[in-house]
Amino acid sequence: MKRAHPDYSSSDSELDETVEVEKESADENGNLSSALGSMSPTTSSQILARKRRRGIIEKRRRDRINNSLSELRRLVPSAFEKQGSAKLEKAEILQMTVDHLKMLHTAGGKGYFDAHALAMDYRSLGFRECLAEVARYLSIIEGLDASDPLRVRLVSHLNNYASQREAASGAHAGLGHLPWGSAFGHHPHVAHPLLLPQSGHGNTGTSASPTDPHHQGRLAAAHPEAPALRAPPSGGLGPVLPVVTSASKLSPPLLSSVASLSAFPFSFGSFHLLSPNALSPSAPTQAANLGKPYRPWGTEIGAF
């Protein structure tokens, strides 16, 4: 009699293996039809039901494997970087996962569980993706070939910047949790030296560091017309955005992740500010006089 709720006990597996052995022996002797014909209709229906059940189990097993590989492709940074350009094989995903785990083990087991290290890893990957998109835009939309001076300067600058940021993040990896602004290589409340307003007077060309408070004060006095574009003074940090979450909607693992992320508040000073020279109306006039299309980002690249 057929059971209403079939189980997947060891007896079923043994019976399935016995049936497979009988089929193989029948194939070898050429007596497959006679072997099946000797069974009763009840036994034949049970064999077909078990085969159908085995196919369902095999399909579920393959689905679990594919879902796990998809999660690994999303979680492992090296696999996540390559998934947009080419299709990864299962062996490649597993190899990247093994390499990533070895790297974490070498780093002391802190790398992937460190919120700052995780954010820096994906920030580096995102910057590389943006760099590739800029190169595609220059070649496809702007029509600039690989030997164009503007394209060479821009791509070279972005490559150098990415390499410097990766080297800086690697140097700070052993210092524990750092504020988000340290990922940019300068203090969050101080603007980038290349984006500070340049003065033509000789008193601002001294040997003072761009991050020196007195140097910042002289620059502020030399350019009083752009108060909104200057960063806050070095005595205090800029406005901070706290991470706001609802504890009642998060599971315990997510709560621990949010707690670790709350140690790194975002600061408006971390984002690079534009120089007032970049907003001056003389840039379009100069570009028009040269007979070239106006590219405001092209005029700024020459300073690097």
UniProtKB/Swiss-Prot annotation:
Recorded name of the encoding gene: HEY1
- Give this protein's Gene Ontology molecular function annotations: cis-regulatory region sequence-specific DNA binding; DNA-binding transcription repressor activity, RNA polymerase II-specific; protein dimerization activity; RNA polymerase II-specific DNA-binding transcription factor binding
The compartments listed are: Nucleus
bHLH domain boundaries: 49-104
Q: Which UniProt keywords apply?
A: Developmental protein, DNA-binding, Notch signaling pathway, Nucleus, Repressor, Transcription, Transcription regulation
Please provide, in alphabetical order, the Gene Ontology terms of the cellular component aspect for this entry. nucleus
Subunit structure, per the record? Answer: Self-associates. Interacts with HES1 and HEYL. Interacts with HDAC1, NCOR1 and SIN3A. Interacts with GATA4 and GATA6. Interacts with CCDC89/BOIP.
Q: What is this protein called?
A: Hairy/enhancer-of-split related with YRPW motif protein 1
| Protein species of origin | Canis lupus familiaris (Dog)
